[in-house]
Amino acid sequence: MPATDNRPGENAYAPGDVIKMHSGLTVEVLNTDAEGRMVLADALSYAKQYEPELVIDIATLTGSAVAALGPHGMPLMGTADEAIKQQIIDSSFEVHERLVSFPLWEEYSDMMKSDIADVKNVGGRYAGTITAAAFLKNFIDYPWMHIDMAPMGWNHAASAYRLKNGSGACVRLFYDFLKNKCSESAE
């Protein structure tokens, strides 16, 4: 689990900085509030050394995910094959932590290109959830899925299925998905 201290200080990065990441890629910092994707990018790069069959990351990465889906679902994007994506989507509906597959078209990666670095850390005004995933895609070379859990990470009111406050979103989802994958492997 990647973690870091996030506070102002003399070594804090600033808009306009170019940072060399774990992977060796350089990132132009346009928005210092997009710090979560910077940490996650290094973690995804670090994971390459283990040659994973699949990596699924979850993060409360963007407010635009909340704007897109409200508190009723979470965006799913990635490079994993469609069958695996469908399996996790099926699990998400089974446990009522619904995922919606968002596209990760090449045009979104184009939005992340920088004139002074390999990539920039934000893509601009449009498709913030997708461009965040497009940024992360630069740091993987294995099957990968990204879940932006921001829409369901915090419940402002209780419902029949979820308590108020921290939701524990994705715990049931991963349990169901992995249970099904283990059952599939045992057959």
Language model features with spans:
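A generic structural signal for tightly packed, nonpolar segments enriched in small/aliphatic residues
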Residues: 1-187
